[in-house]
Amino acid sequence: MAQLRIAIVGVGAYESSRAREYLATIQKLKDLYSICAICDRNQKSLEEAGAQFQVACRYSNFEKMLFIEKPDVVFVLVPTDGQIVFALTAARHKCHLITEIPYSLTLDFGDAVAEACDQNGVKWEIAENVWHWPNEQLKQKIVRKGLLGKITHARLWYKSGSYHGFNAIRMILNSEPTQVLGFAKELDMQSYDSYGGQQESKIWWENGVIEFENDVTCLYESSSASGKWGNHWEIEGTEGYLSGNELVLHSGRTTYSFEETYDQIGGERVLAAIGIGQSTSSSNFDPILWENPFKQYGISAADDVAKASILYSLHQAVTTGANLEYGRRHARRDMELWITLRKSAGLNNIWIDIPLTKPTDLEKRLRSEYIKNYGGDPVTDTADLLQSSFRRLSVMWSVAGWL
């Protein structure tokens, strides 16, 4: 299998950072990737990550790294506001791309990256993880097998980064959304520390209804009280429902919990499969099983499986011409749902059709806030913004209360 040379920009400030987790996963996929270089403006983080993962080629200047190393793939793991700048730069250097979620701050910004990739003949995968989790892949199989009968509706509670939740629902339903009704309000709240470390006393509440092509309705809520559930979703059909990681069938009112099996790989206990109906002799359906395609690498934790799946998707697209498993189309749609919900809320809660046909007022405010904070437009002033210090807390937070 062809090995691709991958460079990572943004190595995380801490050993437990998400970027370091990705580096650890990449190192396990030795037949797919070799880490040729890492890049970060924080010298301390750069040296720590270089030592931790034994990467000799370390850069603080991104373009210098691209010119010297000429990586096949660039993985952009900088803060959200900086992703478009580094992604556009890498694409213009004819590097294949993986970027962190979401698609982009606005649909137009993401479309600019997609266009740059097309113009330079490179692939772009977006690192949406939720639908790749083993439990979620099993849910997708359960619905495809028809155990729930005709799907009628879904319920979603998601506290931050709701494009993740929309992604989970869409992938289980395997259907396209057609229209959205949204409600949103900024609320006073007891003082708390935000993701960026600042004291905040406001929080956004959101509620929405999403209609899908197959006559399924999704009811969505995000609020400070959703901590009661955490991030939780349910899929209901005429024959039963999925709630969290349980299947309930109306016939006999039988509940089936997801069952995990493990193998010993290199002395480690590694997830081999997750399924339903294997150990229940009374079940009236054949067992349904998801098997871990990465167990030979010792990859076991749910989010590590997701990371490996994302990396594998791009590798296959580059080396074999296979379609990306997620890609721009899905990433755009998940972000578009959130933007459409806020458009509906801003227009006194009217139904809005999908796809959107022009930039929304929210997207225009996001672009204006970006220019105000960083001094330029990321699409037209890309080179000038490469040396900017991008904040951990995105303009999505200051404008919309989104993470």
Predicted segments, located by residue:
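C-terminal glycine/acidic-rich active-site capping loop/insertion
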Residues: Q199, E239-E325, D361-L403
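Glycine-centered short loops/turns at secondary-structure junctions
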Residues: K94, G121, D215, N348-N349
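Short, conserved SAM-binding/catalytic segment
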Residues: A49-V55, V113-C117
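Beta-strand-loop-alpha-helix segment that lines the small-molecule cofactor/substrate pocket
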Residues: L66-I68, V73, P79-T80, I84-W131, ...
